[in-house]
Amino acid sequence: MDKVLLIDKPKEWTSFDVVAKIRGILRSLQPQNQSTESVLEKVKPPKIRVGHAGTLDPLATGLLVILVGKATKRQDDYMKKDKVYEVTVRLGSTSNTGDDEGEKTHVSDDIPSLDEVRKTILQFIGKIHQIPPAYSAIKIDGQRAYKLARAGKDVQIKPR
């Protein structure tokens, strides 16, 4: 089976959680060896390759491209595609995690005008470099940044 699946990743699931769930479902659909032979003589079904093109942070929801079988060989092709992000923003506060889940470190009633918001948004059009938050799925020395941050480690991520 060679497929590309478009999955709406639920909040609090990691991208790997989605891959593992899809892999489990696909394995359960494989025909089982119903032989009355001994367990040692049963033939294991072939492994199913399942991967994803891109990672979403655990708190993010949205489209996750799941690749099955030979489609996994085209991961780089999917990773190079343009992406569009839709966000919801709460103005007037910051948190220690850079998201709505963390402890509020600053709260203000001084909300910018719609015109100020529009001018600020213009700074984010085109190719830009940003520093991802410490509580993100980016890997640092093989570990997810959010896991390091939750463990109290100082997480330094370079602009991308």
Language-model features: where?
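Catalytic/RNA-binding core of pseudouridine synthases
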Residues: 1-160
